[in-house]
C-alpha cells in the first residue's frame, strides 16, 4: 500500500492516510526524496521568508496550552500605533518584506479597528501583510482586504470537537464552529490567502492531519481564485508548563510534512522558528517552501518598543536573518523576501 501511495499519479486523502500511517515510517527517506523532487518542480529553489510581529498579549480566552491565556499572571502589553510604526520600521530595516501581525482573541482594546489600523500601517511598508488574529465576519475581512491585508493565518488548533472543548475552557475562542468557518469567510471577503494548521500535540495527529487535508481541499475547491498554505506547529514550552497529551516527535513531523507535500504538491508548506535549527535546515526545500526567520514572540521585540512580557511560546531557532539566509544559500536555496509588489494587490 505504501508503494502504491508513493507512485500514485493523483494522490488524495486515501494516499495521505497511508503515508501518515506507521507502515510508511520505514520509507521516510523515500518519502523525503519524492517530497524534494515535487518541491523543486513546483517551487524551484525558492524559500520565502516572513517575520511575525506580536501587537498585543491581551486576551480573555482560557486556552490551557497558551502563554497568553487570561489566567496567566504575567504583564499584558499592547503596542500603540506609534509603537507599531517603530516596530514595522525596525523589521523593514532587517530586509523583511512579508510580515505576520498577531494578537490574542478579540477584546475592546485590540479589536477589529485596531487590527485594521495596524494593517494599513504595515501595507504602506511591506509587499505582503498577513494577520493571525481572532475570527472575523466576512464584512470585517473585506475591510482588512481594503486596508491592504493579503491573507490570514488561523489554526483550528484541533479538529476534534471534544478535545477542542477541553483545551478552550472559556472566552470567545471556545466557539469551535466560528473558528472553523473563519478561513472561508476570509476568502469570501476578498483576502487572497488562508493559512491553516492544527497544533500538533493536542489531539491524535492522524485525525487532525486528515481533517486539515479535508479543510484545505474544501477551500481550494470553493475559492479557486484564492490560495491556501499549511503549517505544522508543535506545542512549545510556555509559562503555564502545559504538557501535550499527544507528543509528536521530529521524525513523525518530518513524515507529516513529506506526506502533505506528496498529496498537495502545489500548496505552500510553512515551518516556523518553533523548530530547532537542525530540523529546519533539513526541511528547507524538502517539502517546506516558506519559513520565518529572526522571530520574536513577545509583544514588539524588534525595536525600542520591545516589551518585557512573557512570550507566547519559546523560540527554538534564534538565528538572525543573515545567518538563516546564509544557511539557505549554503544548501543551494534562494531566500526570497518579496513575492509580488504591493501595487498589484488589487490587480488580480
Where are these regions (language model features)?
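Canonical Radical SAM [4Fe-4S] cluster-binding loop centered on the CxxxCxxC motif
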Residues: 44-83
Amino acid at each position: 500500500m505504501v508503494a502504491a501511495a508513493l507512485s500514485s499519479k493523483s494522490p488524495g486523502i486515501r494516499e495521505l492516510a497511508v503515508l501518515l500511517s506507521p507502515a510508511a515510517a520505514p520509507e521516510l527517506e523515500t518519502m523525503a526524496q519524492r517530497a524534494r523532487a515535487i518541491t523543486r518542480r513546483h517551487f524551484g529553489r525558492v524559500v520565502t521568508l516572513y517575520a511575525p510581529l506580536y501587537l498585543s498579549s491581551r486576551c480573555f480566552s482560557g486556552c490551557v496550552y497558551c502563554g497568553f491565556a487570561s489566567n496567566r499572571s504575567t504583564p499584558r502589553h499592547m503596542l500603540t500605533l506609534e509603537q507599531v510604526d517603530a516596530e514595522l520600521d525596525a523589521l523593514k530595516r532587517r530586509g523583511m518584506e512579508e510580515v505576520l501581525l498577531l494578537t490574542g482573541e478579540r477584546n475592546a482594546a485590540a479589536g477589529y479597528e485596531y487590527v485594521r489600523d495596524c494593517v494599513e500601517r504595515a501595507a504602506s511598508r511591506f509587499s505582503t501583510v498577513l494577520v493571525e488574529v481572532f475570527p472575523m465576519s466576512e464584512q470585517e475581512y473585506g475591510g482588512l482586504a481594503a486596508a491592504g491585508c493579503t491573507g490570514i493565518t488561523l489554526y483550528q488548533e484541533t479538529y476534534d470537537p471534544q478535545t477542542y472543548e477541553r483545551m478552550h475552557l472559556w472566552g470567545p475562542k471556545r466557539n469551535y464552529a466560528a473558528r472553523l468557518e473563519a478561513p472561508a469567510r476570509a476568502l469570501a471577503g476578498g483576502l487572497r490567502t488562508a493559512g491553516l494548521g492544527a497544533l500538533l500535540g493536542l489531539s491524535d495527529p492522524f485525525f487532525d492531519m486528515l481533517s486539515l487535508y479535508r479543510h484545505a481541499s474544501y477551500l481550494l475547491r470553493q475559492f479557486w481564485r484564492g490560495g491556501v498554505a499549511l503549517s505544522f506547529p508543535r506545542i512549545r514550552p510556555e509559562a503555564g508548563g502545559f504538557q501535550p497529551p499527544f507528543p509528536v516527535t521530529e521524525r513523525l513531523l518530518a513524515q507529516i510534512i513529506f506526506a502533505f507535500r506528496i498529496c498537495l504538491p502545489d500548496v505552500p508548506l510553512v515551518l516556523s522558528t518553533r523548530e530547532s535549527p537542525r530540523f529546519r535546515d533539513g526541511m528547507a526545500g524538502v517539502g517546506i517552501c516558506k519559513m520565518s526567520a529572526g522571530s520574536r514572540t513577545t509583544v514588539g521585540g524588534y525595536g525600542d518598543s520591545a516589551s518585557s512580557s512573557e512570550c507566547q511560546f519559546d523560540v527554538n531557532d534564534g538565528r538572525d536573518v543573515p545567518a538563516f539566509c546564509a544557511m539557505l544559500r549554503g544548501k543551494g536555496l534562494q531566500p526570497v523576501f518579496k513575492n509580488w509588489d504591493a501595487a498589484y494587490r488589487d490587480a488580480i
